Curated annotation (Swiss-Prot):
<keyword id="KW-0238">DNA-binding</keyword>
<comment type="function">
    <text>Negatively regulates transcription of bacterial ribonucleotide reductase nrd genes and operons by binding to NrdR-boxes.</text>
</comment>
<dbReference type="GO" id="GO:0005524">
    <property type="term" value="F:ATP binding"/>
</dbReference>
<dbReference type="GO" id="GO:0008270">
    <property type="term" value="F:zinc ion binding"/>
</dbReference>
<keyword id="KW-0678">Repressor</keyword>
<keyword id="KW-0479">Metal-binding</keyword>
<keyword id="KW-0805">Transcription regulation</keyword>
<keyword id="KW-0863">Zinc-finger</keyword>
<dbReference type="InterPro" id="IPR055173">
    <property type="entry name" value="NrdR-like_N"/>
</dbReference>
<protein>
    <recommendedName>
        <fullName>Transcriptional repressor NrdR</fullName>
    </recommendedName>
</protein>
<feature type="zinc finger region">
    <location>
        <begin position="3"/>
        <end position="34"/>
    </location>
</feature>
<keyword id="KW-0804">Transcription</keyword>
<dbReference type="InterPro" id="IPR005144">
    <property type="entry name" value="ATP-cone_dom"/>
</dbReference>
<keyword id="KW-0067">ATP-binding</keyword>
<dbReference type="GO" id="GO:0045892">
    <property type="term" value="P:negative regulation of DNA-templated transcription"/>
</dbReference>
<dbReference type="Pfam" id="PF22811">
    <property type="entry name" value="Zn_ribbon_NrdR"/>
</dbReference>
<comment type="similarity">
    <text>Belongs to the NrdR family.</text>
</comment>
Amino acid sequence: MHCPFCGTQDTKVIDSRLVADGASVRRRRECNHCKERFTTFETAELVMPRVIKTDGSREPFNEDKLRNGLLRALEKRPVSLELMEQAINKIKSSIRATGEREISSNFVGSLVMENLKQIDKVAYVRFASVYRSFEDIREFGEEIARLND
């Protein structure tokens, strides 16, 4: 790997450890030429399937859309960003585990709901109200009743 300080290719790894629940490797490196030290992070680059939207159009999986949807549902709720990131990683792992090249947006939505139900029931109902297009208060009540079952 090139040294970011002097540009030499001659660097060595002096320490490696797993981070982010084993999803990444943090490496401390040292340049053999200028002796500067720096940190790199290594993660597997995995291709996510395309998402088939309800109107039939297709688009690449967008992690930012997933994160924003979770942030909206979890807004002002006592849930840490770390817990939310874990949910994002679980959802992405479930999507990858299908082995499919394309998945439906409904499948993604159901994974989000499944994870929100485990994290925060209020956020789950918030997300469900948008995802399922609740029309009136009765539908909220029915969803809350299903939570208690």
